[in-house]
Amino acid sequence: DLLDNRSLAMLLEISKRLEEKYSCVKILDKTNSGKANSLNDALKIVDSELIAVTDADSYPKKDSVIKMIGYFEEEGVSAVTSRVLVKNKKNFLEKFQVLDYSIIAWSRKLLDFVDSVYVTNGPLSIYKTSVVKDLGGFDPKNLTEDIEITWHILSVGLKTRMSYSAIVYTTVPSKFDNWVKQRVRWNLGGIQTVRKYYKSLFKNPEHVFGYFVIPYVASAFLLAIIGFLLFSRYLWIKGTYYLFSFIYLFQGYPFFKYLDFSFSLTLLIFFALLFFILSIIQYKLGFKNSETGNKSVLKILVYSVIYRSLYIIPLILALYKLSKGDLRWYTK
């Protein structure tokens, strides 16, 4: 089935061509009410054992679906996701996302080994139809229905898997403002999901969901915020002290001295450096044998220091919007 919710002007026209060419294709034409609502409408007429979901701006490889289906032979597996790679690779932002998506995919595959794949991505994922229907379908109130349905599946003790060999290419934002909007939505949806399922924390020792997935995701949010606050506090104290201490300026004290860091071998600095080095090693391994190639340490350093530092911007904006209860822009 092809579902057109009028989110892309040309989608209906293209879908009709496919419907004319293939007898198995059926179009559901409806006004744009959000992806989750549209998927739920499609669920009402689907009677197959499995349902595959992909986005209009994504391009799965021909053998991707076949490579994913085999995972459902394992008992309890109710959703399988794919490896998402970047299709457009022209400007610097797009190239940074090439690295970003490769690392995300590699990290997600590692989580697969501990039954903790907590996102079945929108570009290409396959679900057991009966399970999704039993769970009430996709949550239309959540901005990231792919995250929410995955957590819902895990919360009832079922499994999710990732096929690293099943590849789908997606079109990523080429402009910074669009990148920020996308990541704000991701952060908002992630926070919504944590708030919805936090009561499962440390419940049912037989399920990894409450003992690993929730703490893992929640701690990632908290560490990012704490790191930002500590860094901001450092700059504020240093900046206020030196900028307003005229005696230092008159004596020739360097104006930007407050930006210098003290690299004394404190326990905090030691663990920070250790974490950074381990991250570089992780990224290096993530690029090995991937379609992005074996990236140089310099490129990984630039990615780690510059691009990853930008992550805090959409997170702060998401928290601000959440504090105002403003989710309207992202649900239009």
Question: What are these language model-derived features?
Answer:
Residues 1-31:
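Acidic donor-binding segment of Leloir-type glycosyltransferases
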Residues 2, 58-59:
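Acidic metal-phosphate-binding loop of nucleotide-sugar-dependent transferases
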Residues 5-6, 63, 74, 163:
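Acidic/polar residues in short coil/turn loops that connect beta-strands
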Residues 13, 19-23, 36-38, 42, ...:
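Long helical/loop segments within the catalytic core of UDP-sugar-dependent glycosyltransferases
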Residues 38, 149-150:
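Short, hydrophobic alpha-helical packing/hinge segments within bilobed ligand-binding/sensory domains
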Residues 72-108, 141-143, 150-215, 219, ...:
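Catalytic donor/gating beta->alpha subdomain of glycosyltransferases that bind UDP-sugars
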Residues 199-212, 239-332:
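Juxtamembrane C-terminal module of membrane proteins
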Residues 222-241:
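Hydrophobic, aromatic-rich transmembrane alpha-helices
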